[in-house]
Amino acid sequence: MGEDTQKTQDFTEAHPGNTSLHGEYTVNGASGLGELYVKDNDRITIEFKADEDYFLKDVIYNGKSMLGSMQETYASDGSSQGSVSFNINNTSAVQTLEVQFSPEWAYSTALSGGNIVLSRYVGRNTVVNVPKTWDYYTSASNKVTMPVLLNKSDMGSGIGPFGENREIEIINYPVGGVQCLEHNYGFLYADCVSLRQINNMIYDNAAVSYFGTFARCSSLSEIPSLGGGAALVNIAYMCDGASKITQYPYIGGSQAAPAGVTRIDMAFNNCKSISGTYRINNTQIDIQKAKNSFATHSSGYTNVICSGNTYNSLAFYKSTTSGWENVALNGARSAMLMMDEKENDSIKEKSEPVTVESTEEIIPEDTEQSEDTEETETIEETEVAENTETVEEGTEIEK
């Protein structure tokens, strides 16, 4: 570096040598921190390696957090080894540097519209407390307090901010919630197999996608009310494999949920035990002990498959030009009903058969039906056997 402008930066005893609690690091390639020569406005590069199950949490330079100056603190796969760089412009002869490692938060700190973005949580704690705000220090050491946002998921890899964390049992959001960036809750909790409780919630006031939000959350028994605003555009695979759901929320947080859903695709696929009420667009889907529930909605047709259901388990309300049309699978063990919205006024005249198949061994259970389930008038001429034990494999029930 320029010899005429060299200054000796004496890093204090806050960090003797090149080690820190639960990890080690180098500064500008030097493992011994006795003397470093850096110019004003020069850059410091820290290469770090955390101990097992620990991650980089913060870098404190002259008593200020420098995380806000970092675009990314670690590899996207949640690695605890990597490098970070930031500019310095302090002319003080004595500088202090502290590198912190934590078993909890590992940040991705790109800024977005004056907010701190949390892209990934890779901690090992069973209880996670999501911060409401975070202090960011500018290059001029000015402190700015910014809201924390949750970043959208990487749809290609199927990983959300908390995705694939098998240790998390409880997530505590701050009162008032945390907003999700770009209105995408995709895979937010996917594969959080130990997650059993979510307190408070994220919120949003714009178009929302819930693609795979609770996929394979096998320990979560109740989903809290979800955010939602002007439009719900996609709830595909939302609860795929979430096997113990006992209560669904109102999408949008109220009975008068917003309109505009463009896709419901396999929302309840492979859900082994479901009960309760699910509402979307002010329309109710009653689910009673459903298994492998599959629901699709598009502008062309509605396809409802309830595979392996022993009970009167699913009622799907389909949008038509004349209003909502109730499609019920009354006691069908495995059935498929396909209806074209263009033909919603002449469904009775459709010639395709409804196929009812047995896909697994029948285990006698209490077959008491839900009080909320009603036989539909729109397919009154389609008779689906209510006693699943009498339905033979491959039997077709003609209209």
Predicted segments — roles?
Residues 3-11, 24, 37-38, 67-73, ...:
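Solvent-exposed loop and capping/linker segments of extracellular ligand-binding repeat ectodomains
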Residues 30, 51-53, 91, 121:
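Short glycine/proline-centered coil/turn motifs in the loop regions
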Residues 37, 41-44, 52-54, 338-399:
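Mature, Sec-exported extracytoplasmic domains of Gram-positive
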Residues 42-44, 93-97:
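Exposed beta-strand face motif in extracellular beta-rich ectodomains
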